[in-house]
Design a protein with these regions (language model features):
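Serine-hydrolase-like catalytic core of hydrolytic proteins
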Residues: 1-127
């Protein structure tokens, strides 16, 4: 499971709130003899550095919405290397609240859905 934190796309970080503490999820996944989960939190650029867009930026060779690219790269990294820390790169669920939930929805629909995604489940909360 990977988590994308919220914060209105302008604030936050992977360890910056109590909702980011995975201990309850991990304990619940091990209850009753369950094998548990691997929990990975990611960071991404925020504010103007993460979400600038427009024709002037693109004409100057800039990348619009770099925060989404940061997230996509991190998700792809988790899928590629999950096996190195006991996970299954073919069984990734994204969890996110607020801007994190919205980001999950953006990842699903990015590129008109033509590029696909490297995760198999999504839990967008209050996007």
């Amino acid at each position: 499971m990977s988590r994308i934190y919220g914060g209105g796309y302008v604030e936050g970080w992977k360890g910056g709130d109590t909702q980011g503490n995975p201990s309850g999820l991990i304990k619940a996944s091990q209850a009753g003899g369950g094998e548990g989960i691997i929990f990975v939190q990611i960071n991404y650029r925020l504010g103007a550095m993460g979400w600038l867009s427009g024709p002037t930026l693109e004409a100057a060779g800039g990348v619009s919405n770099a925060g989404l690219y940061d997230q996509r790269l991190a998700i792809e990294w988790v899928a590629k290397y999950a096996h190195l820390f006991g996970g299954d790169g073919k069984n990734i669920t994204l969890l996110g609240e607020s801007a994190g939930g919205g980001s999950i929805m953006h990842q699903i629909t990015a590129f008109g859905g033509q590029k696909g995604v490297t995760f198999q489940g999504a839990i967008p909360q209050s996007p």
